[in-house]
Structures are given as structure tokens and as C-alpha cells.
Amino acid sequence: MAPRFSRPRLIDASDAQYRAFVRQIMIGKDNQRATRPPLPRELFGGEAEAALRDWLSQRFTLSDRRIVEYLEHRGRSAIKKYRELDAVVLSEQKSIEVFEIKASQKANSLRRAAQQLNDTRAILSMLFRRVNTTILLVDTGIPTAEDVADLMALEDAPPVPPPTLDEVLAILPRVHLAASLDARDPDPEIVNLLRFSVEDIIALAGGENLHLNWDEEELDEQDVAEPPEEPAGPAYAYTTGEPPVEDEDDNPLAAALRKAMSGGDTGKP
């Protein structure tokens, strides 16, 4: 089977080709219809990402090279794409640690994060001998088994119960929940998972610096259908393997860029 990815480069935001790409995306964004401003929950996602990146920086030296340029092959065509990594540690010349940060109230966001990291590992393995991956999950209301039981007892219960985190972990044997950074599995085939609460983020960033005023109207507005597991992506993508939809686990910049890119041209690089 032909490789799905090729010609990767690990770059920073000053890369000339990447800057030209972003300019193209922002021009496309200007031509799109006006969109609603981000909700507090979406803003919190970006704030939580910044807080956890700062937390990681107290333990590791984070690299500015956290953008991956690569070709994705589909049949006889190849499309240039870009993928932003939330945090990168270049501990050795041929070793890299990649962190994916998610703030979500849906357990299924873990499945998407794991798939994104699996693809990232496949791409970066062409550059590095060892690629370790970790998900930092901020739980903003993932239902417990008791929550699901109460929900399904209601008259207007959904037709399908939302999965709990334990249920999702049960179908992802290569995702291991770790109690701390030091307790992570060193096996590069394993995706490690560290779970954080909203209170943990408040302790890191301070409640006054976070958007925490989530009301029922906002929660209802974000109750959208789950996207397909492997959606067809646009020709150019800021992050790939993610559907170009609004979700509570998107940070505002990435969501805006993905929305702007949804009408991009296709073609060979």
C-alpha cells in the first residue's frame, strides 16, 4: 500500500510558505459571510490550552516548531496540508513529544484526539525515530454513568445515550489514562491521557482570566450532531483529520481558520 503521507517539515510560524498559506486563508475568511462571535465555552477552550501550555513550559522546554507541513496522498493526487500541534518537546535529536490539548464535554472528543495523534505520529515518524504522544483533556462536563442514567430516565431522553469516558476508553486500548506526567507509558505506540477538571484550570490561570459564564442557552446551541469519524477534508487544512465544524473542543483561532478554509481550492502542490 502506498504511503498516505510524505515530505513532512516541522516548522514554526515564521516559515515563508506557511505565512503565505495563512494569508490565503485569511483572504478567504474575509470573503465568507459573517459568523457569530465565539461562545464563552469556546473561549474557555483557548484559555485552557494556553494555561496548560504554560504548565508544560514549567516542566519542559517547548519548541516553537509546532507546525507540520506535509503531503497527503489520495489516489494519484497529493495535497499540501498543515497541522498545528498544541505543544512540542524536542528532547533529543531524533525524539519528539507531542501534546494534544482538548477542552470538551463529550467523551467522543477523545476518539478524535487519539486519531489526530495517530496521524501525527505517522507523519512525524518520517522525521523522528521516536514519537511520543499525550492528550491533555479538560473535562468540562463529560457525563458519568449516573448522569447518563438520569438523562435517559427523562421523558425527552435522547434516542442514544451519550458515552461516558470509561466507555470510550474501553474501545481505545492504546489510550492509557495516566495520573501524572511522570506516570505516562513510555511506549510510543501508546497515547497517554491526562485528565484535568475545570477547577484545575482555574487554579492554573485564575478564574478572573477565564470565560466561565456558560448558561443553558449556550449549552443548547452547542449540542450539535457528532461528525463522521473520517470526514472528507478540504484541500488545505490548518489541522487535518478534524471536521470543519464548530465544537466545544475547538480553540477559536483553529475553528476560524478551518471555517475559512472550507471553501479552499484543491489540486496538486
Predicted regions and their residues:
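OB-fold/S1-family RNA-binding modules
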Residues: 229-269
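Intrinsically disordered, low-complexity Ser/Thr/Pro/Gly-rich regulatory segments
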Residues: 1-228
